[in-house]
Regions:
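An alpha-helical, amphipathic repeat domain used for nucleic-acid recognition
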Residues: 5, 9-116
Length: 116
């Protein structure tokens, strides 16, 4: 087998791995694009492969994962007021690798109970 076909085979393997990794981390571990990107980088997957894989994650699917995660976390967050709780929620989601713009959109869409 030639060196060129070995390189091609490795790229196909890396692509398949990157797809499976991204799918599993988003679905089961509730990771955002940034954290998935970091993981793929650490595993030695090339930027053009993981860039393409991350671009294929639809925003709908992404929000579908993030909203329930934020709703569940909201119930356990303690803070002096809703603003402080929302900031903690944002920090939590950023730590899981989600982007600020998506987090903000999800928080804005959430029915956040106020302490009346």
């Amino acid at each position: 087998s030639s060196a060129a076909s070995d390189v091609y085979k490795r790229q196909i393997d890396d692509e398949r791995f990157a797809h499976a990794y991204a799918h599993d981390k988003l679905t089961y571990d509730k990771w955002g694009r940034r954290k998935i990107e970091q993981g793929l980088y650490q595993k030695g997957v090339s930027k053009d492969i993981y860039g393409k894989v991350l671009d294929e994650i639809s925003d709908e699917r992404y929000i579908e994962v993030l909203k329930p995660l934020l709703s569940k976390k909201w119930k356990t967050i303690k803070g002096r007021n809703d603003y402080e709780c929302a900031m903690k929620l944002m920090k939590y989601a950023l730590g899981r690798g989600f982007e600020l713009s998506v987090i903000r959109k999800c928080i804005d869409d959430m029915e956040i109970p106020t302490d009346d």
